[in-house]
Each structure stands twice: as structure tokens, then as C-alpha cells.
UniProtKB/Swiss-Prot annotation:
Entry's family note: Belongs to the ClpX chaperone family. HslU subfamily.
Identification of the protein by name: ATP-dependent protease ATPase subunit HslU
Gene name in the database record: hslU
Keywords: ATP-binding, Chaperone, Cytoplasm, Nucleotide-binding, Stress response
Sites where the protein binds ATP: I18, G60, V61, G62, K63, T64, E65, D248, E313, R385
């Protein structure tokens, strides 16, 4: 659990997302309130519920990215889902309780990885012993084993192929799903693969190089040192206390008052979400999960529907409203220059792997931002995602010929951008299809 202050959280989000100050402040306060709640006494702690958030804004302005970065900062179980993927209970499709089951699955995987790291040193020693035994043979003398161990540590045996007996993690039930219930495994709540594991599981013999075998052996030896019940208990606590669920496209299940049609399950999805967001208990294969203190962040563009078209009860369960504004040309310039994961840095690094040096000049960056903003304005506003399309088009020729141009320096200025994009950006009909 992160103990960052709201100011520190916003500062960290600023490294990856430009603008949207109100949304950043809202999620920062929501995260800090979790830390505050943990400082309270037992009598009051259960009474403090998270203030769920509704983000309203066009596509590509940072709604999803804010939530994803927040989850990483909080080191919390996180799940992003689309509201349109779910149907009302009784109809063919996934019901909303699957959200919590998927969140629990993600939490167990994260918790297991974290606990593996804690026992990695001991697991590494056991893995090394198994590799030495495979190299020297089971009945080898201690002196021979030590000789192989020394060579192993010096990396002299990395390419040598050995045969090992490993746990078979593939589940014969993995691909069996209930017809019409995507993502719902055959066997319902029964974890058949876990049942097989309890009886020792299946082991297979595999031939691997010494270097390849280490990661598999360390993971297997670490799992032997872990208590499965402790992993599940820690994961379920993380879900219940720190879980974050991001529900995208919530506006697509908001039925407009004047709308007519056969989409009967839209309002039903909203009704099914009510108890989940309010607080209920969901059965998972790891045990029951209470959703009372899971933070729900819903988002939507609300181009056609309005937030007031949501069920009044659902509106009441999303008390914090945040509007995200559309991005401007100046925002695009900042996105290309100020963020830690800026596209300019990414393309420079990608071309450097081919020995090509790429230099972005300020007027080139401004030209990219201008064209992205113009196309957004004239065709369809898809926010920062337009930059991906524009830059990919500019670099199309260079990306193809880069292996033949090793040692060259390419300067991306306004003329370079104009040469590769000028005609397309000026022709609305063409940009509608190409950009």
C-alpha cells in the first residue's frame, strides 16, 4: 500500500499524462483516503467507504492511463473492463460478478510473483543444485559436483543442454469454456486444475539449455517454498482493501430516455452493477470477496448519452464527477516532449537499435502536433491516439529502410514532416482513411 501524499501522486502522474489536473487530483485524494482509512481504529475503519469516481471526457485524453498509472503507484490489484462486454443475469454472456473473479485472479498472480521474489535467494540455491545434479549425474561425488558448480557460476555451461523433470502447468481444462459464457471455465466454481495440483500434478521431462532452465527451476522451487493458502489469503485481502476496478464505456450502457430498440440488457447491466459498487460478497474460487472497499472508477465519452441518463441509483454510487477536456495542439507538443514515455523518445530508441540516429527539431514536433490537432478537428477527435497514427505515417519509410541506413542521422524537422504528410493532412477525404 502506497503512502504517497496527494501532491506526490499528482506529480508522479504528471510524468506520464499531460493536463487533466482535476482528474489527477480526484484520484490522488481517493488513493490517499485509503491510507487515511488504514490509520483509523477498527470501530470506524469499516464505516469509511471509498468515494467512487465518474470520469467524463472524449476518447484519448488520458482516462484509462490515469487509472492504470494510479494502480501501479498504489501497488494495488487493478482491472480494466468495458461495460459493453457484460450482460444482465439470465442473458447469454458474462455477468458483472466476473469482474471481481478476474480481479482476484490478477491479485493472486501479482501476490505470488511478489512472494516468489521474497524467497528467490533460497529458490536459486535449490535450482542450482538441480542443474548440477543434471550435469554431473545423481551418483556423482561431491568433488565432481563442486567442479560443475564452479563452471556453472562462471557461465561456461550456459549453452549445454540438460534434461529435467518439470511441473506441467498446462491445464487440460484451460480451453474448455461454457458455451455462451466467454471467460467462464467449465466446472463453474470448481478449480479442477487446482484439484489436480493437490494430487501432485503432472510432471514432464524437457530438454533445455542451462541458461533457459534457470527461470523455470527458480519459479518451481519458489512455489515449493510458498504456502498456497497464505498466497490466496494475502491476495484476497489486497483485493478487498486496495482493489481498483476501471469500468470503461459506461456511457454505452446508459439508455437514453428517447431511445427505442431491442437492447433489453443495457439497463440490466446497470442494475447488476449497483450491488457490486455499493458492496456485496462475490464467490470466487479462492474464497468469498467483499466489494465494500474496492474503488470503482467509471468512465465514458458521453457523446450521445448524458451522465443523467444513468440510473439514479448508479449516479448516487459514483459521487465524484470529473470532466476531462479535449487535448489541444499545445497539449500535443507537451506530450511529445515532456512525458517520460514520449513517442519522440520511443522512436529515437527504436531507430537507434538499427544504428540510425534520429533528431527531433522543435519545428518538426510543432508540425506533428499541428497536423494531429487539425485531423482531430476535421475528421474525428480521438485525442492523443492521433499522434500514434501521424508519427507512424511519418516514420513509415524510415522504419522500412532503417537496416540499410545504419550510421546515418535523420533530422525530423517541419520539412521532413511536410514531405511525408503534407498532402494527406490537407486532403480531408484522404486523411479520413489514412490518418
Amino acid at each position: 500500500m502506497s503512502d504517497l501524499t496527494p501532491r506526490e501522486i499528482v506529480s508522479e502522474l504528471d510524468r506520464f499524462i499531460i493536463g487533466q489536473r482535476d482528474a489527477k487530483r480526484a484520484v490522488a485524494v481517493a488513493l490517499r483516503n485509503r491510507w487515511r482509512r488504514r490509520q483509523l481504529g477498527d470501530d470506524l475503519r469499516d464505516e469509511v467507504y471509498p468515494k467512487n469516481i465518474l470520469m467524463i471526457g472524449p476518447t484519448g485524453v488520458g482516462k484509462t492511463e490515469i487509472s492504470r498509472r494510479l494502480a501501479r503507484l498504489a501497488r494495488a490489484p487493478f482491472l480494466k473492463v468495458e461495460a459493453t462486454k457484460f450482460t444482465e443475469v439470465g442473458y447469454v454472456g458474462r455477468d458483472v460478478e466476473q469482474i471481481i473473479r478476474d480481479l482476484a485472479d490478477a491479485a493472486v498472480i501479482e501476490t505470488r510473483e511478489r512472494m516468489r521474489d521474497e524467497v528467490k535467494a533460497r529458490a536459486h540455491k535449490s535450482a542450482e543444485d538441480r542443474v548440477v545434479a543434471a550435469l554431473a549425474g545423481e551418483g556423482a561425488r561431491e568433488q565432481t559436483r563442486e567442479m560443475f558448480r564452479d563452471k556453472l557460476k562462471r557461465g561456461e555451461l550456459d549453452d549445454k543442454v540438460i534434461e529435467l523433470e518439470l511441473q506441467d502447468n498446462s491445464s487440460p481444462f484451460g480451453m474448455m469454456e461454457i458455451p455462451g459464457q466467454p471467460g467462464q471455465p467449465m466446472g463453474g466454481m470448481m478449480d479442477l486444475s487446482g484439484l489436480m495440483k493437490a494430487f501432485g500434478g503432472r510432471r514432464v521431462r524437457r530438454k533445455l539449455s542451462v541458461a533457459e532452465s534457470y527461470d523455470l527451476l527458480i519459479a518451481e522451487e519458489a512455489d515449493k517454498l510458498l504456502d498456497d493458502e497464505a498466497v490466496k489469503a494475502a491476495a484476497l485481502e489486497a483485493v478487498q482493501e486496495n482493489g481498483i476496478v476501471f469500468i470503461d464505456e459506461i456511457d454505452k450502457v446508459a439508455a437514453r430516455t428517447d431511445a427505442r430498440g431491442g437492447d433489453v440488457s443495457r439497463e440490466g447491466v446497470q442494475r447488476d452493477l449497483l450491488p457490486l459498487i455499493e458492496g456485496t460478497t462475490v464467490s470466487t474460487k479462492y474464497g468469498p470477496v467483499r466489494t465494500d472497499h474496492i474503488l470503482f472508477i467509471a468512465s465514458g465519452a458521453f457523446h450521445i448519452a448524458k451522465p443523467s441518463d444513468l440510473l439514479p441509483e448508479l449516479q448516487g454510487r459514483l459521487p465524484i464527477r470529473v470532466e476531462l477536456r479535449a487535448l489541444t495542439e499545445e497539449d500535443f507538443i507537451r506530450i511529445l516532449t515532456e512525458t517520460d514515455n514520449a513517442l519522440t523518445r520511443q522512436y529515437t530508441a527504436l531507430m537507434a537499435t538499427e544504428g540510425v540516429t534520429v533528431q527531433f527539431i522543435q519545428d518538426g514536433i510543432r508540425a506533428l502536433a499541428r497536423i494531429a490537432a487539425e485531423v482531430n478537428g476535421s475528421v474525428e477527435n480521438i485525442g492523443a491516439r492521433r499522434l500514434y497514427t501521424v508519427i507512424e505515417r511519418v516514420f513509415e519509410e524510415l522504419s522500412f529502410s532503417a537496416p540499410d541506413r545504419s550510421g546515418e542521422t535523420v533530422v525530423v524537422d517541419a520539412a521532413f514532416v511536410e514531405k511525408h504528410l503534407g498532402d494527406l493532412s490537407r486532403s480531408t477525404d484522404l486523411s479520413r482513411y489514412v490518418l
